[in-house]
């Protein structure tokens, strides 16, 4: 059998796997050094008691014949979809438009497969690498990188001459940590509606938005129901990175060019390829929604980000993001190349970060810091960053 040619388009190693490998090698060679890993955006705070209690109760219920449950509905438990519609969307979205899934990555894969390979896809640059890799794996015909530069507030530069079938956006953004205003989001929705573009909006970090003057969901823009699909997840908001529970929204008003609703085909795809998310996790998510709009861990991570940002700026770095997201997008000091970025922070500060060029060509000249760690790690990182100014560190380097 011939190899699927799409896999030849992928880099030999996934970005974060490569970082883990380099970090493991450094620790092996330097066992006496304590490295603070601020590279990978995994959660660290334990689950809230209300969630673990719901998990325990559901597990016990499965021991009894009268309460045992087999398959659930492919689109998710009605009570969970209803609660998401109410708590997250303030009933702007109906439960029938919400589909419970096992994660944002699988949703991206399903969506790209759903639309088919003969499409033109616009991706932010820098972008979370999974988008680009999944686009390659699913055989998307044309992938157009859309530059997101600091001069434009890390908002994508949209093409005027070339039409996009699909436009993927992530806000609060990974990796830049930036957010959109209502006016900025309205302009992107207007573009999508004017050009017949389907806008896939990744709102996985929406729980980090605490300012009511900023949008959390694309559906806070009324016209978005004609052009947008939203992805969201419990991974960062409730600490479900290892438990896997997410959802996506397909509005009834979203149609093909023949005016047929897309939601009908999406239901068919879900029923064919997915038996539904774990009932155990759905029960956990249902009770976890009681912690919204700002689950306790979110406040802790945002405090981490604020402390880290202050220390980085005090040390002399230029920092973006971190106010409504767990990520800080830090400009590399002059004289440090992209190839040296990881080693610079690892050797000078004993801090592991993610090199920006791994997110795309427009990530060159930056690194990403993650605040999704324990407060004591942030305190130690801040101490190391402030021990010497950036100018002094550059002399040492």
Curated annotation (Swiss-Prot):
Keyword Transferase (UniProt): yes
Pathways involved: Amino-acid biosynthesis; L-lysine biosynthesis via DAP pathway; LL-2,6-diaminopimelate from (S)-tetrahydrodipicolinate (aminotransferase route): step 1/1
EC number: 2.6.1.83
Residues bound to substrate: 14, 41, 105, 128, 174, 275, 368
Keyword list, A-Z: Aminotransferase, Pyridoxal phosphate, Transferase
TM regions (residue ranges): none
Similarity annotation: Belongs to the class-I pyridoxal-phosphate-dependent aminotransferase family. LL-diaminopimelate aminotransferase subfamily.
Designated name of the protein: LL-diaminopimelate aminotransferase
Organism: Chlamydia pneumoniae
Gene name, Swiss-Prot/TrEMBL: dapL
């Amino acid at each position: 059998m011939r190899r699927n040619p799409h896999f030849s388009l992928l880099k030999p190693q996934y970005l974060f796997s490569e970082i883990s490998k380099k970090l493991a090698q450094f620790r092996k060679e330097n066992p006496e050094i304590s490295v603070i890993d601020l590279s990978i955006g995994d959660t660290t705070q334990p689950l809230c008691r209300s969630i673990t209690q719901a998990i325990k109760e559901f597990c016990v219920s499965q021991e009894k014949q009268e309460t045992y449950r087999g398959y659930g509905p492919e689109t998710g438990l009605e009570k969970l979809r209803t609660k998401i519609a109410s708590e997250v969307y303030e009933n702007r979205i109906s439960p029938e438009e919400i589909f419970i899934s096992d994660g944002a990555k699988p949703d991206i894969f399903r969506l790209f497969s759903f639309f088919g390979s003969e499409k033109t896809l616009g991706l932010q640059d820098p972008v979370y690498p999974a988008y680009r890799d999944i686009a390659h794996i699913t055989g998307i015909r044309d992938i157009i990188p859309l530059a997101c530069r600091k001069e434009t507030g890390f908002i994508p530069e949209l093409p005027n001459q070339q039409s996009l079938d699909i436009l993927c956006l992530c806000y609060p953004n990974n990796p830049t940590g930036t957010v959109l205003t209502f006016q900025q989001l309205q302009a992107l929705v207007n573009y999508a509606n004017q050009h017949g573009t389907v806008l896939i909006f990744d709102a996985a970090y929406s729980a980090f938005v605490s300012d009511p003057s900023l949008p959390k969901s694309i559906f806070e823009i009324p016209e978005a129901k004609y052009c947008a699909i939203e992805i969201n997840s419990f991974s960062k908001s409730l600490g479900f990175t290892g438990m896997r529970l997410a959802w996506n929204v397909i509005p009834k008003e979203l149609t093909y060019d023949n005016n047929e609703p897309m939601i009908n085909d999406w239901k068919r795809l879900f029923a064919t390829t997915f038996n539904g998310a774990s009932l155990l996790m759905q029960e956990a998510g249902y009770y976890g929604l009681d912690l919204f709009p700002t689950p306790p861990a979110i406040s802790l991570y945002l405090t981490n980000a604020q402390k880290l940002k202050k220390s980085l700026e005090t040390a002399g770095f230029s920092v973006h993001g971190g106010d409504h997201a767990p990520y800080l997008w830090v400009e590399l000091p002059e004289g440090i190349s992209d190839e040296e970025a990881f080693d610079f922070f690892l050797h000078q500060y004993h801090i592991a970060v993610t090199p920006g060029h791994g997110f795309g060509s427009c990530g060159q000249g930056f690194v990403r810091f993650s605040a999704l760690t324990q407060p004591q790690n942030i305190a130690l990182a801040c101490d190391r960053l402030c021990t010497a100014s950036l100018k002094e560190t550059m002399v040492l380097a």
